[in-house]
Amino acid sequence: MKTLSIKEPYASLIKNKVKHYETRSYDTKYRGEIFIHASLGKKEACDELWKMVGKVLPGYIICKANLVDSICMDDEFINEVKKNPWEYKSGYYKPGRYAWKLENVEVIKPIKAKGNLGLWNYYSLEEVMNLLSDIKYGYMNNAGNVCYSFDTFDDDYVLQSYKDMLKTKTGVCFDQVELERHYLYNRDITSYFICYYGEFLQSHTFLVVKENNKYIWFEHAWEKFRGIYEYNSLDELLNDLKNKFMNEYNILDKDKILLKSYSKPKSSINLSEYFKWVENK
């Protein structure tokens, strides 16, 4: 859903139905339902406005509303707004600026999220899984061609960016994690790498989402276990995945398995460079 980050106390003033216009220097053509996200920072406001909001939740989506209009301010409009002093004090009104009109405000269960500038997209995990539904398992080689045969994978694989993935609609787990990272960047996410270094080499990457003190294994690339799985602890999640990995590939020696988190790699690196990154970062 489209989301708007607003500093406190103004986000909570919308939630509490004191503020009905979000004032901006620019227009928007978007009309429809939006989330209101309380930014981490605070904005200067008079004591009376702070008293109207009570406890605030910076870093959380706190309500939703309908964005029904974007009004270019003129003197007549501003004079009308001034009839409601709290509305006027809750925004920056000047001819040529815009007032985004919000209606049907509804308080929701707070959702922890990282904010962004302008209108940005917040996706549920189910929505992201649906966005990935047309992604096929394959890879892009160093000539920019999409491949579904893995005969030369070790020699010509390159890691795609999320923009590449949106074009090719194809990727192995390494690539798919980067597309998932793009969609879920505003969540508490960690990417993980698991690899067996034995008589053969087998690896996998996946994403873990922390949400409401739960740990979620988000899996799309591994078709057999495609889905969203919730656990009470990170250890429980990682142990379950490790056991599934060992059973899937008939691995008996768990001491030859590396399971670790890794940070976002650069795109367009080859397989050797990718392994060096995930093994050491």
Q: Which residues fall in each region the model found?
A:
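Short, well-structured alpha-helical interface segments that form or flank functional binding sites
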Residues: 16-18, 57-62, 168, 172-179, ...
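Hydrophobic/aromatic-rich core segments of domains that either
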Residues: 175-250
